[in-house]
């Protein structure tokens, strides 16, 4: 991109426009629908959704819990990353997070299947990972709401068996790259 003036390098991991788009867009839409957000859960990916929405929700209500869903170290879930693997995207401000919760591939797949079966959402495995953490957070609360964004759909997972096989039949579920 440096050599070609008509090319663009977005670099979502370090581009401040990434969280800004969620701060000015996604978070505003959430607050238009809900007066209160008690917890917001997003995947630990580029950091754009987590930081942009998280910052706006904290400004609206400092008591809102901002939670990152993070795969276990060494496990690869498309769109998510473990900070323990060594890379922290430049746009991530860890001080904004109230919690960072690990999710296994197994839980991510089980929740991906539940989203389809129970809610009719043809979501991807990263959405299942985030939903698993949402359920955990909701289980800790007496009342309130937990918000999350479905960041991917299921098309790229169709040949993996995620939607057709029980988790117990998926070989190497904890060592497979789910993308």
Task: Place the predicted regions along the sequence by residue.
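Short glycine/serine/threonine-rich phosphate/pyrophosphate-binding segments
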Residues: 43-53, 126-134, 157
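Hydrophobic/aromatic beta-strand patches that form the interior of the parallel beta-sheet core
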Residues: 8-10, 41, 67, 101, ...
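Short, well-ordered alpha-helices that flank and scaffold nucleotide-derived cofactor binding pockets
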Residues: 32, 55, 59, 132-139
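ATP/nucleoside-binding phosphotransfer catalytic cores, i.e., glycine-rich phosphate-binding loops
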Residues: 115-117, 143-162
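Active-site/ligand-binding-proximal alpha/beta "capping" segment
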Residues: 7-45, 56, 106-122
């Amino acid at each position: 991109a440096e050599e070609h003036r008509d090319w663009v390098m977005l670099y979502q991991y370090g581009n401040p426009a990434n969280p800004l788009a969620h701060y000015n867009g996604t978070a505003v839409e959430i607050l238009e629908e809900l007066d209160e957000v008690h917890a917001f859960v997003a995947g630990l990916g580029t950091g754009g959704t987590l930081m942009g929405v998280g910052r706006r929700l904290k400004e609206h209500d400092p008591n809102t819990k901002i939670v990152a869903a993070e795969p276990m170290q060494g496990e690869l879930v498309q769109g998510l990353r473990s900070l323990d693997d060594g890379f922290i995207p430049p746009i991530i401000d860890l001080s904004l997070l109230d919690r960072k919760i690990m999710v296994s591939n197994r839980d991510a797949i089980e929740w991906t299947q539940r989203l389809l079966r129970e809610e009719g959402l043809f979501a991807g495995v990263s959405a299942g990972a985030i939903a698993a953490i949402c359920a955990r957070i909701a289980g800790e609360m007496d009342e309130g709401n937990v918000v999350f964004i479905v960041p991917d759909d299921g098309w790229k997972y169709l040949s993996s068996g995620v939607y057709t096989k029980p988790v117990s039949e998926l070989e190497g579920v904890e060592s497979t790259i789910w993308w």
